[in-house]
Amino acid sequence: MAVLQKSMSFSLMGTLAASCLLLIALWAQEANALPVNTRCKLEVSNFQQPYIVNRTFMLAKEASLADNNTDVRLIGEKLFRGVSAKDQCYLMKQVLNFTLEDVLLPQSDRFQPYMQEVVPFLTKLSNQLSSCHISGDDQNIQKNVRRLKETVKKLGESGEIKAIGELDLLFMSLRNACV
């Protein structure tokens, strides 16, 4: 009788272990099938440093004084049109990278001393978002970013100055979308 109980006990344990493994495997498969925004987050502390916040806003203010085109807004409601809230950080990552590469670096000799302090800060944010990807459809995001890039390029140097003048909006949009 004791031998029969032991063999049933081992059989039950084996069945239980196999069931657990099956559940874990199914859970892992389902987790892989879900669309995930990878690391599309920034720490709130990035946006709570008074010195760099001040420098970013001062740079934007100085550039906006040189901006004579008041009819165009680069970072506003149109930029987010058709983009779900969960994908807005990815959108802002794209805008940040464009701003760094195509606007701030070519204009890096202007608006000193703010530029030399703000560019490394924004580069740090860009690096923190480097693994931010979306696995879903990003058609609206790409369309909106392309429209922003085309507007800046069409305006030429004036567009670059406008983009620098909107660094305060970029800063706030990054905080709102990525924290």
UniProtKB/Swiss-Prot annotation:
Q: Does the keyword Transcription apply?
A: no
Q: Which InterPro entries match?
A: 4_helix_cytokine-like_core (IPR009079), IL-10_CS (IPR020423), IL-22 (IPR020453)
**Which region is the signal sequence?**
1-33
Q: Which residues form a coiled coil?
A: none
Q: Name one GO cellular component term.
A: extracellular space
- Reading the lineage from the top rank, the first entry is Eukaryota
Recorded GO MF terms: cytokine activity
Sugar attachment sites? N54, N68, N97
| Pfam families registered for this protein in UniProt | IL22
Which cellular compartments is it found in? Secreted
Q: What SUPFAM superfamilies does the annotation carry? A: 4-helical cytokines (SSF47266)
Q: Which cysteines are joined by disulfide bonds?
A: C40-C132, C89-C178
Write the record's keywords in alphabetical order, separated by commas.
Cytokine, Disulfide bond, Glycoprotein, Secreted, Signal
One GO BP on record is: reactive oxygen species metabolic process
- UniProt note: phenotype after gene disruption: Deletion mice have an enhanced response to agricultural dust as evidenced by an exacerbated increase in infiltrating immune cells and lung pathology as compared to wild-type controls. In addition, T-gondii-infected mice display a significant defect of the epithelial barrier and an increase in macromolecular permeability when compared to wild-type mice.
What does the function comment of this entry state? Cytokine that plays a critical role in modulating tissue responses during inflammation. Plays an essential role in the regeneration of epithelial cells to maintain barrier function after injury and for the prevention of further tissue damage. Unlike most of the cytokines, has no effect on immune cells. Signals through a heterodimeric receptor composed of two subunits, the specific receptor IL22RA1 which is present on non-immune cells in many organs and the shared subunit IL10RB.
Q: What is this protein called?
A: Interleukin-22
Q: Which organism is it from?
A: Mus musculus
**What lineage is on file?**
Eukaryota, Metazoa, Chordata, Craniata, Vertebrata
